């Protein structure tokens, strides 16, 4: 056990009190002046103390186990309290508390200074003297005679002696669980390494008990901090988080006590003789060390020596180093934590402004560099991150026309988040097409009155020349083929001739043989044979003729409808009464289904009443259409770190009596861990066999016990809220304008009705999108910093390793402390590896922070751009990176909707001043109408393919409305109804076709509705013919004939000029010759 070199200087004075059970007062070394700094009146003992069950005192004490005295007061150790109450070392025999170590001269407990802090926790009320370890020492507090400590423990107050709640008599309160021992000194270099490793484990601790631990820019007020530590005899203690301990036994004569059975402790001389001559009896370990006598002498005549039951001396393994410290324990200290200045939230960006450039905007931030920004123009968006004060952000090419509202949302490098709005005037109509013989030229010939005909004729000539060239090439290939085939034909002819000649000779030989035979037999005959002449027909020359037809084919006819949808309310539940000032007050109830429109457009519900020329509109303007996460059950995930610890005890020491105890289960705790970890925390315990014998520091050769525990903790208190997405459904941002003019913005998610506003509730019915890989995604939010991410995760109740959500907690508080009654986990997340005398662990926990940093918002996943959303339906919104169509509609329920309609017909006249924009596009054409109205009213414009409604003010005003067309040249009559007054207006103008937008880096487009037929339609041949020749089949035919005749005439003219030029050149050469 403890090697106490000053044992011989101790003098035990036995004071008999009621027999052998009286306390023993042992005087310390005479030269020691302990306790001089704290007078007895402050509750501290004088130069004597009482020590219980310590091997360096007396063997007599070992024979009186009924003694219950504690160190520190004349009344014995029963007057000493410990905090926390479950401290374990205070109950162990053979271990020194700091009180004992102070009395023995191993350390010094000093009187507390004014700057020393009293840790909160235990109740101090009453006449109490208390001590606690500090970061650089051990201090004590006390009050003088007639005073008692206040409940907060901060000061002493007068004690009447009869106050209720005061602790009786004098008491000592020891804060912490500490065991002290003679240490093995370590060099300064080792101490610095331990200190550095400790600082890496506690990077957010600034000061401990007023002593600087880490340099911090900002720090909190001191607060209680429970931590394990060891005192290695240097300037301050080493605080530890993950460490291991083992208890070693070292055989020494000081580890045995000798006594006579029934008599008492042996005298000093007898004990010395037993340990040197082996003349006594003893247990196995004593006999192994000192030797024993095996006579039959009566037991009371001989001393018997036995090993003191003790855990041994503690060796701490920390940071890869093994240290035998002076003291090892777990206690409460006062620490300050690092405080980072709060990040500036969304606000104004001083010095930020927009500049409009071709195809995008330039964002200038004068105060700080731009970290990231998202800029939306109409339903096109683009994001960028530059790190500069001037950043150009481009949109889809050809996507922006006319006056466009710009919405900017971003963050600066200094942490400032900002939002602001602006507008830009982009080229409109034919002004947006500024190139010759390019794609835009081909798609919009109406913008080039003269160049288009020249281009068409050139194309026809080039086509004709290409056909001629192709025919000549084919002719040349035919001639070349005849040259190649002729030698082959000649070779076959020669072979055929040779075969005929050979066949003829063979025939003649056979005839000659027959003739000889006939002559020999005397028969004469003649044999006549006609020769057959075979004549090969010569192939005739084939003449090649050239045919160059020109064919134009109309493949399909494109159709288009309106973009701003209008539905006329058809409700039979309408009641009206006469109001004041020629007004009729009506109340209506019903339901209507409006086709959903694209961002930036409006759907109108048109209300009229019998007998009233006036009408009103309920308008739904769509600002954005995104995808939102339809959340399933959410849970909380701690920023968990794996921890493990182990303690090795030799056989028959402490809990290791006959090996691993059967009662030590997965939820058991070793005495070494008492107070050092939360028993309600999430963890797993176990016990395994370790090495034994002298080589492992054990008296017993049987395997020792390695008690180990693995657990998880949240050292920084970081919590993530994880919301798995059951589906990604469309969500709209709409602006609802009531017939009365009141406006309210809603964020309806598909299938979820909005709150009732003035009797109206809107339900957005959007179809689901089939996008692969999104069902496993989850919204991940860090609750403190509000950091957002989108990543795969586990569903609630499932803990698949490798995904976020391996540890799931039901509440924010349970995630902060990781309580086992509020969290679930897979114990295999923390692996344990047993070694000779300790255990090490390894972690399989997926780092939520690493995943969140990798997939932080904004991000692009599966062809969708995800960004932060500030509405109540979801924190993240997704937008496809390509033109994605969904089907949708708005269900409008109105109950008790009030309408104020005028009974007087308005005098309203007007004209269309300009038609510009695009056809077969999302935004539609912009129609400028100048109206003169005698009163405020509602105007309704109905054209062949579209209609719209808008509010009209009294007097002369200009209005710009959107109408959709499917042809480039607009020339038609539209009906205008303004406050009951019917008239006609003429629309004339040229529209352009905007190509399907091309994407630039970082750009994307919000979702649009396929039920609105103006969504990026590719023009058909009819659109092109309309733009080229005008509307109508007769114009197309005349235009095509004119182009062909013009091309043919130009061809003949060019041929004539070429021939004329050739003749002139030939004549010039003839004259020169």
UniProtKB/Swiss-Prot annotation:
Signal peptide range: 1-19
Residue numbers on the Cytoplasmic membrane side: 475-535, 1058-1073
Disulfide bonds: 26-49, 143-156, 180-327, 206-216, 258-305, 287-292, 349-352, 356-424, 376-381, 563-604, 576-586, 629-725, 644-841, 650-698, 656-705, 660-687, 691-696, 778-793, 809-823, 908-978, 918-921, 943-974
Residues of the site described as Cleavage: 562-563
Region (Golgi retention signal): 475-521
A GO CC term attached to the entry: host cell Golgi membrane
Glycosylation sites: 33, 63, 853, 914, 936
Biological-process GO terms, alphabetical: entry receptor-mediated virion attachment to host cell; fusion of virus membrane with host endosome membrane; symbiont entry into host cell
Residues passing through the membrane, by range: 454-474, 1037-1057
Pfam family, one: Phlebo_G2_C
Region feature Internal signal sequence for glycoprotein C, mapped onto this chain: 536-562
Keyword Transcription annotated: no
Keyword field contains Disulfide bond: yes
Residues covered by region (Fusion loop): 650-656, 691-705
Gene3D superfamilies (alphabetical): 2.60.40.3770, 2.60.98.50
Domain of life where this protein originates: Viruses
Important for glycoprotein C and glycoprotein N subcellular location, annotated site positions: 1071
Keywords from the named record: Disulfide bond, Fusion of virus membrane with host endosomal membrane, Fusion of virus membrane with host membrane, Glycoprotein, Host endoplasmic reticulum, Host Golgi apparatus, Host membrane, Host-virus interaction, Lipoprotein, Membrane, Palmitate, Signal, Transmembrane, Transmembrane helix, Viral attachment to host cell, Viral attachment to host entry receptor, Viral penetration into host cytoplasm, Virion, Virus entry into host cell
Lumenal domain ranges by topology: 20-453, 563-1036
Family: Belongs to the phlebovirus envelope glycoprotein family.
Protein name: Envelopment polyprotein
Species the sequence originates in: SFTS phlebovirus (isolate SFTSV/Human/China/HB29/2010) (Severe fever with thrombocytopenia virus)
Top-level taxonomy: Viruses, Riboviria, Orthornavirae, Negarnaviricota, Polyploviricotina
Protein encoded by which gene: GP
């Amino acid at each position: 056990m403890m090697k106490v070199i000053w044992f011989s200087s101790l003098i035990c004075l036995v004071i008999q009190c009621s027999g052998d059970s009286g306390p023993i007062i042992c005087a310390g070394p005479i030269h020691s002046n302990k306790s001089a700094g704290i007078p007895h009146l402050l509750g501290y003992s004088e130069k004597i103390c009482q020590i219980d069950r310590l091997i360096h005192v007396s063997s007599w004490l070992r024979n009186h186990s009924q003694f219950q005295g504690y160190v520190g007061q004349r009344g014995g150790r029963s007057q000493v309290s410990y905090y926390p109450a479950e401290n374990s070392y205070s109950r162990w025999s053979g271990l020194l508390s700091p009180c004992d170590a102070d009395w023995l001269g191993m350390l010094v407990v000093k009187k507390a200074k004014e700057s020393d802090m009293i840790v909160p926790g235990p109740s101090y009320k009453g006449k109490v003297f208390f001590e606690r370890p500090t970061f650089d020492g051990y201090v004590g507090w006390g009050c003088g005679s007639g005073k008692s400590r206040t409940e907060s423990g901060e000061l002493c107050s007068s004690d009447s002696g009869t106050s209720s709640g005061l602790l009786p008599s004098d008491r000592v309160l020891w804060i912490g669980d500490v065991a002290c021992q003679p240490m093995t000194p370590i060099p300064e270099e080792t101490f610095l390494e331990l200190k550095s490793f400790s600082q890496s484990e506690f990077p957010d601790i600034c000061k401990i008990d007023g002593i600087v631990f880490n340099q911090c820019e900002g720090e909190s007020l001191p607060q209680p901090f429970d931590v394990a530590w060891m005192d290695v005899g240097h300037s301050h203690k080493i605080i530890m988080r993950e460490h291991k301990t083992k208890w070693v036994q070292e055989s020494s004569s000081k580890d045995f006590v000798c006594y006579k059975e029934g008599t008492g402790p042996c005298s000093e001389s007898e004990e010395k003789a037993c340990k040197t001559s082996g003349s006594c009896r003893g247990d196995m370990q004593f006999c192994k060390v000192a030797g024993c006598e095996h006579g039959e002498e009566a037991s009371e005549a001989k001393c018997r020596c036995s090993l003191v039951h003790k855990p041994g001396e503690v060796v701490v393994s920390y940071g890869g180093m093994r240290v035998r410290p002076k003291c090892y324990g777990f206690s409460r200290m006062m620490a300050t934590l690092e405080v980072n200045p709060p990040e500036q939230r969304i606000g104004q960006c001083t010095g930020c402004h927009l500049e409009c450039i071709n195809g995008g905007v330039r964002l200038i931030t004068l105060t700080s560099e731009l970290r990231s920004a998202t800029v939306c123009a109409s339903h096109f968006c683009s994001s960028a991150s530059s790190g500069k004060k001037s950043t150009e952000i481009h949109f889809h090419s050809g996507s922006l026309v006319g006056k466009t509202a710009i919405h900017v949302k971003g963050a600066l490098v200094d942490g400032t988040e900002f939002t602001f709005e602006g507008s830009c005037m982009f080229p409109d109509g034919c002004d947006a097409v500024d190139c010759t013989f390019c794609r835009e030229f081909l798609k919009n010939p109406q913008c080039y009155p003269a160049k288009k005909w020249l281009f068409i004729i050139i194309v026809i000539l080039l086509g004709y020349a290409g056909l001629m060239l192709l025919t000549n090439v084919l002719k040349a290939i035919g001639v070349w083929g005849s040259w190649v085939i002729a030698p082959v034909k000649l070779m076959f002819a020669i072979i055929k001739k040779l075969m005929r000649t050979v066949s003829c000779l063979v025939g003649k030989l056979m005839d000659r043989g027959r003739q000889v035979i006939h002559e020999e037999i005397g028969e004469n005959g003649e044999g006549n044979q006609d020769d057959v002449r075979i004549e090969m027909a010569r192939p005739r020359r084939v003449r090649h003729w050239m045919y160059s037809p020109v064919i134009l084919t109309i493949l399909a006819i494109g159709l288009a409808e309106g973009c701003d949808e209008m539905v006329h309310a058809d409700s039979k539940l309408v009641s009206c009464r006469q109001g004041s000032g020629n007004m009729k007050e009506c109340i209506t109830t019903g339901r209507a289904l409006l086709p959903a429109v694209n961002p930036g457009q409006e759907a109108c519900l048109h209300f009229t009443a019998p007998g009233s020329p006036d009408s009103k509109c309920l308008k739904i303007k769509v600002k954005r259409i995104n995808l939102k996460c339809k959340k399933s059950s959410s849970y909380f995930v701690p920023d968990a770190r794996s921890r493990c610890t182990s303690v090795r005890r030799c056989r028959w020491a402490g809990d290791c009596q006959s090996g691993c105890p059967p009662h030590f289960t997965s939820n058991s705790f070793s005495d070494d861990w008492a107070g050092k970890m939360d028993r309600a925390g999430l963890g797993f315990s176990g016990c395994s066999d370790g090495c034994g014998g002298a080589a492992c520091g054990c008296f017993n050769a049987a395997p020792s016990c390695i008690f180990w525990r693995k657990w998880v903790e949240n050292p920084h208190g970081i919590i993530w809220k994880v919301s798995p997405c059951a589906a990604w459904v469309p969500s709209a941002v709409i602006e609802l304008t009531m017939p009365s003019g009141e406006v309210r913005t809603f964020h309806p998610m598909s299938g979820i009705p909005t709150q009732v506003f003035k009797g109206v509730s809107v339900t957005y019915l959007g179809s689901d999108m089939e996008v692969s890989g999104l069902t496993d995604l989850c919204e991940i939010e860090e609750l403190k910093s509000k950091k957002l991410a989108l990543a795969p995760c586990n569903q609630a109740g499932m803990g698949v390793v490798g995904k976020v959500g391996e540890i799931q907690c039901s509440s924010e508080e349970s995630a902060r402390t990781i309580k086992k009654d509020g969290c679930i986990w897979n114990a295999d997340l923390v692996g344990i590896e047993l070694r000779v005398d300790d255990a090490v662990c390894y972690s399989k926990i997926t780092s939520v922070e690493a995943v969140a940093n990798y997939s932080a918002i904004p991000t692009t996943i599966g062809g969708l751009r995800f960004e932060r959303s500030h509405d109540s339906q979801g924190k993240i919104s997704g937008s496809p990176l390509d033109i994605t169509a969904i089907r949708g509609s708005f269900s409008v329920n109105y109950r008790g909707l009030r309408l104020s309609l005028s009974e007087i017909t308005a005098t309203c006249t007007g004209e269309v001043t300009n038609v510009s924009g695009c056809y077969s596009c999302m935004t539609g054409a912009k129609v400028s109408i100048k109206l003169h109205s005698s009163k405020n009213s509602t105007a309704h414009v109905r054209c062949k393919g579209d209609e719209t409604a808008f509010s009209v003010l009294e007097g002369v005003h200009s209005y710009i409305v959107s109408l959709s067309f499917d042809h480039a040249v607009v020339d038609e009559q539209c009906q205008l109804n303004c406050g009951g007054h019917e008239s006609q207006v003429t629309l004339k103008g040229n529209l352009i076709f905007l190509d399907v937008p091309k994407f630039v880096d970082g750009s994307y487009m919000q979702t649009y509705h396929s039920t609105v037929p103006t969504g990026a339609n590719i023009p058909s041949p009819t659109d092109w013919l309309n733009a080229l020749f005008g509307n109508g089949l007769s114009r197309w035919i005349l235009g095509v004939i004119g182009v062909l005749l013009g091309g043919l005439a130009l061809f003949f003219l060019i041929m004539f000029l070429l021939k004329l030029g050739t003749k002139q050149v030939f004549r010039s050469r003839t004259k020169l010759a």
